[in-house]
């Protein structure tokens, strides 16, 4: 996270894009660096919650996932920036014997709780489950799947809705 902070200071205002295990350091960086003006995260693997509001651990065959407590003062920073999370296909709603599926099942469940927590505290977080909007076939490496241009267009539309791609006066 210190390296992300140094990079943030060097490049200035930016939108942070994270993937998988990079999601957790992304949340930490966004909480610590005012230069982070938004976060787009592809299937993040870890999540932060305000102290006293960490949901119960979600167990699964791969060990499950637990939220990480942070002071409310830090968490509130996530409520001040737009955040979007994308999750791909092949993620079951019920426990699976396929370890990869199971790993992302519990993380998607925790992502839902994370987005709900941010929005409950006045934030602007969105969770996009691609199959629910008619986009199928994505693996965990969404950005390199055959429909990566379609996913890039989704991100572009979000950036425009957040006014990141328009000149600010």
What residue ranges belong to the model's regions?
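Active-site signature of alpha/beta-hydrolase-fold catalytic machinery across serine-
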Residues: 28-32
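Conserved alpha/beta-hydrolase fold motif
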Residues: 16-17, 39
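Gly/Ala-rich beta-loop-alpha elbow adjacent to hydrolase catalytic centers
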Residues: 17-26
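The feature captures the conserved acid-bearing segment of alpha/beta-hydrolase catalytic domains
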Residues: 46-121, 126-128
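Short glycine-rich catalytic loops that host catalytic nucleophiles or stabilize transition states
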Residues: 128-137
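Catalytic active-site module of serine/aspartate enzymes centered on a nucleophile-bearing elbow/loop
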Residues: 137, 141-169
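Conserved acidic catalytic loop of the alpha/beta-hydrolase fold
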Residues: 1-15
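A conserved short beta-strand
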Residues: 33-53
């Amino acid at each position: 996270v210190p390296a992300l902070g140094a990079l943030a200071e060097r490049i200035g205002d930016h939108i942070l894009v994270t993937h998988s295990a990079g999601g957790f350091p992304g949340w930490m960086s966004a909480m610590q660096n005012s230069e982070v003006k938004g976060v787009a995260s592809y299937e993040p693997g870890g999540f932060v919650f305000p102290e006293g509001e960490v949901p119960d651990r979600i167990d699964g065959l791969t060990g499950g996932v637990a939220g990480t407590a942070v002071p409310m003062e830090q968490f509130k920073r996530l409520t001040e920036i737009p955040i979007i999370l994308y999750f791909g296909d092949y993620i079951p709603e019920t426990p699976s014997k396929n370890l990869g599926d199971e790993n992302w099942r519990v993380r998607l469940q925790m992502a839902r709780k994370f987005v709900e927590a941010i929005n409950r505290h006045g934030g602007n977080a969105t969770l996009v489950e691609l199959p629910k909007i008619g986009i199928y076939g994505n693996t965990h490496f969404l950005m390199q799947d055959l429909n990566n241009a379609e996913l890039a267009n989704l991100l572009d539309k979000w950036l425009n809705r957040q006014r990141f791609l328009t000149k600010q006066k």
